[in-house]
Amino acid sequence: MLRKNDTPGKLIIVEGIDGSGKSTQIDLLHKWLRAQGHSVYFSEWNSSGLVKSTTKTAKKRKLFTPTTFSLLQCTDFADRWENQILPLLKAGVVVLADRYAFTAFGRDVARGVDRQWVRNLYSFALQPDVALFFRVPLDIAVQRITSARASLKYYEAGMDLNLSESRTESFEIFQGRILNEYDSMVNEFGLTVIDGTLTVQAQQRLVRDIIKQELKGWKGLPIPEGSPQILLQSES
């Protein structure tokens, strides 16, 4: 288990396989929270400027092994954690994260990395106050992704694992492995499951109800009265 969040801030994260619709939901939540007067910071997976060029080069040249990929992704997370996420939590800000350590727990293990080793790697992270897992059946997620993109990227499709010569088939197998890991994390880390097949509006109503309950009676860092609502987000 991750350590409990003992900072004045609130950490709210979303997870799900590719095509789950989680990014749409956290974007809507972000805008709603700001409209409610909360200071909100948004961070997304694989967005640290520290390792961006290295990651891009390694992907282009197909240099990653499962272990080196895991370590570099953790470096990205640690950089954002220490320089952005944790300081803002300590300041009483609502931090929203599109993917968190659970993404590594899913993807890295799906690539064959030891489950406990990956969890130990992220032991510095805090347990989110709210962790939403947008669950969709594998076939729906695959259909959403393949219909929205001209082609699947090499690592996104799990082509490094030699699961299939077909990128679409490899993607489906790889995402299936990740989905199995997510399902096993629901009880382990207290993930709240949201039905990703519901309408966008219905999902957002559920999300807001959960967040309202979490923030009930909580006094975080408000946006100063009379000042513009500055959008806080990570560099990408």
Segments predicted by a language model, with ranges:
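Hydrophobic anchor at the beta1->P-loop junction of P-loop NTPases
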Residues: 14
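ATP-dependent small-molecule kinase phosphotransfer cores
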Residues: 32, 36-126
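NTP-dependent small-molecule kinase module
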Residues: 1-5, 30, 146-236
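A glycine- and Lys/Arg-enriched "phosphate-lid" helix/loop adjacent to the NTP-binding pocket
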Residues: 104-177
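Hydrophobic positions on the alpha1 helix immediately C-terminal to the Walker A/P-loop
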Residues: 25
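Conserved nucleotide-binding/hydrolysis micro-motifs of P-loop NTPases
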Residues: 47-49, 101-102, 136-142, 199-200
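Conserved lysine of the Walker
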Residues: 22
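P-loop (Walker A) phosphate-binding loop of NTP-binding proteins
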Residues: 17
